[in-house]
């Protein structure tokens, strides 16, 4: 359970429920791509909102595996890399872009219902609305980021690697994101 004030961490079952829910929304391709890029990469909502088509696609139209985010869209003002290597994310982005209007390379990757780029705030509000409609009280745009960090640690990814993937300056910040349930802690003790 999330501590007071912390965004809810989604379980694998909740993730599957969210995928099913998003597939039935008014903008399923866009909403799935938005959700999955956050859930599978741990990107902050402001960075997702700031993505341009040219950030994620090369000149030949191929989706990049490594996206180097510029400091202009990154908290802390330092460049960092995001890895778009998860097949689920890649498929969702391709599906969205195939139906997305305005494919000029200098335009925002994600557009709202009016065909305009999302602001960080409007994208946060969309995530909040989608999570609530899916029945996940306490979930917000930050739930994807916390879920990513928690899942990575629980699957055995070294916390230093998670720190790098999350673009944290301090490892203690990364530790705050990770939520450990009793089953995980039992397995941890048993493995020592």
Model-derived regions: residue spans:
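Conserved tyrosine-mediated DNA breakage-rejoining catalytic core shared by Y-recombinases
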Residues: 50-79, 83, 88
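Basic, Lys/Arg- and aromatic-enriched nucleic-acid-binding interface segment
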Residues: 12-41, 45
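Catalytic-site neighborhood detector that most strongly recognizes the C-terminal catalytic loop/helix
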Residues: 69-75, 171-191
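C-terminal catalytic core of Y-nucleophile DNA break-rejoin enzymes
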Residues: 74-94, 106-128
């Amino acid at each position: 359970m999330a501590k007071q004030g912390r965004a809810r961490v989604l379980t694998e079952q909740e993730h599957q429920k969210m995928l099913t829910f998003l597939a039935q929304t008014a903008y399923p391709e866009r909403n799935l791509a938005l959700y999955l890029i956050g859930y599978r990469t741990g990107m902050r909502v402001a960075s997702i909102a700031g993505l341009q088509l040219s950030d994620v696609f090369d000149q030949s139209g191929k989706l990049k595996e490594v996206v180097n985010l510029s400091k202009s869209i990154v908290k802390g003002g330092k460049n960092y890399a995001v890895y778009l290597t998860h097949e689920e994310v890649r498929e969702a982005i391709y599906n969205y872009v195939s139906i997305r209007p305005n494919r000029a390379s200098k335009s925002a990757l994600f557009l709202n219902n009016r065909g305009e780029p999302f602001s960080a705030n409007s994208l946060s509000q969309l995530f909040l609305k989608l999570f609530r409609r899916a029945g996940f009280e306490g979930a917000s745009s930050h739930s994807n980021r916390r879920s990513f960090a928690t899942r990575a640690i629980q699957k055995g990814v070294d916390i230093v690697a998670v720190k790098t993937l999350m673009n944290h300056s301090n490892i203690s910040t990364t530790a705050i994101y990770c939520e450990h349930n009793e089953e995980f802690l039992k397995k941890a003790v048993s493995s020592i």
